[in-house]
């Protein structure tokens, strides 16, 4: 477990990346995936979806955007459809929704966690 200071330092360094711990780990190529890094979507990635749909939690829009926003590992749409638990899709979608908030709102959310 990390201390509050470590969490704040990590957030200061990686403001545009959030590590999502999965409720239901899965395997890709024999490697167990327990967490996924979700990064802030670029404008190019956001052109593929309606922002209102993302903010409303539309699963199709979230699954369209996630392959463009996941790293370590990068997940494909097919992997999202077949391997990832719906709860984990929602967790990753929540990370994206948080990135789309103003920094002041993101700071308040971070303090509440």
Indicate residue ranges for each PLM-predicted region.
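Short, surface-exposed, charged amphipathic helix/loop patches that serve as local interaction elements
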Residues: 2-113
């Amino acid at each position: 477990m990390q201390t509050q200071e470590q969490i704040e330092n990590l957030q200061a360094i990686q403001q545009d990346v959030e590590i999502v711990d999965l409720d239901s780990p899965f395997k890709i190529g024999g490697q167990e995936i327990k967490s996924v890094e979700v990064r802030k979507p670029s404008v190019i990635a956001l052109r593929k979806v309606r922002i209102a749909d993302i903010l409303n939690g539309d699963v199709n829009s979230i699954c369209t955007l996630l392959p463009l926003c996941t790293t370590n590992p990068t997940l494909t749409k097919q992997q999202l459809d077949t391997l990832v638990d719906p709860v984990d899709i929602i967790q990753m979608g929540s990370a994206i929704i948080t990135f789309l908030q103003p920094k002041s709102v993101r700071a308040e959310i971070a303090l509440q966690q």
